[in-house]
Amino acid sequence: MAPLVLPSVLIASAYLLSTVSAEPNVAELVGTWSTKSAAVLTGPGFYNPVNDTLLEPTHTGISYSFTEDGYYEEAYYRAVSNPAKPSCVSSIMQWQHGKFVLNADGSLSLSPFSVDGRQLQSAPCTADSATYTRYNQSETLQKYQVYTDPYTKLTRLDLYQFDGTPVNPMFLAYSPALMLPTETLNPTTSATSTSSSKMKRWLGYGDEPEEPTTSEGYLLPLNRNAKHISRGIEQPSLINRIDLDLVWWAGVGLTIFGGAAYLL
């Protein structure tokens, strides 16, 4: 019986190690993940909270970002085909951020900041303009997998929806994550920033920005001077800030003035 003891112990140890290694681990989720084209990325390149606008990427795609302290951000850009009229392709852009929980069973529970989500729907064949609205949708992801893709050799993330339907595979694009501030960016009368101390750390100042006037319960327009929003948003270059029309007319004026001075 003694010779059988060692193999049994080894088998039990191997099983224990495999069980431990299979436990959910937030650290492996940390970073910004994007589908293959990498055209869609979370952060200020997709949603600009200063102007409250969604920025259309060059290609459709999905991006998720996660932090080790339990915050997430997601960006979706999808095309919706029209079988009856193939030339009439609609599009949907969605952006959310908030908090997530990695559950013991490996599932993910995503709870967005309810007032911050944005959705832009465009149907050029049925509407003269796009529809821009607030968007708030909690999510449950049944499971996830992080591994090295055997074909691309890149770190890959597979997410599965609540019913087990796989989301398009994503690959690690940034680590640490490329994200907007992990707090409420567009507070309303019924929702405030996540933490005043956290806000102050972002701002670097002791006072929070004043709230603009309200309209139908929403703060409109957004506080464009709020440093916790504008920080990290790329400012336009000097060339982009120059009024080219003004330069042209100034050139015309100098030419006329020079010609008149020459004749005199």
Swiss-Prot record:
* Record's bilayer topology term: Single-pass type I membrane protein
Recall the GO molecular function terms of this protein's record.
unfolded protein binding
- Regions crossing the membrane: 244-264
Q: Topological domain, Lumenal: which ranges?
A: 23-243
Pull one GO CC term from this UniProt entry.
endoplasmic reticulum membrane
Q: Note the Pfam families from the entry.
A: Rot1
Glycan-linked positions: N51, N136
Keyword list, A-Z: Endoplasmic reticulum, Glycoprotein, Membrane, Signal, Transmembrane, Transmembrane helix
Main localization category: endoplasmic reticulum
Q: Does the keyword Iron-sulfur apply?
A: no
Q: One biological-process term from Gene Ontology?
A: 'de novo' protein folding
Q: Which InterPro entries does the UniProt entry name for this protein? A: Rot1 (IPR019623)
Q: Where is the signal peptide?
A: 1-22
Its annotated compartments are: Endoplasmic reticulum membrane
- Where does the source fall among the domains of life? Eukaryota
PANTHER family in alphabetical order: PROTEIN ROT1
Return the similarity comment.
Answer: Belongs to the ROT1 family.
Function as written in the Swiss-Prot or TrEMBL entry: Required for normal levels of the cell wall 1,6-beta-glucan. Involved in a protein folding machinery chaperoning proteins acting in various physiological processes including cell wall synthesis and lysis of autophagic bodies.
Protein's UniProt name: Protein rot1
Report the source organism: Botryotinia fuckeliana (strain B05.10) (Noble rot fungus)
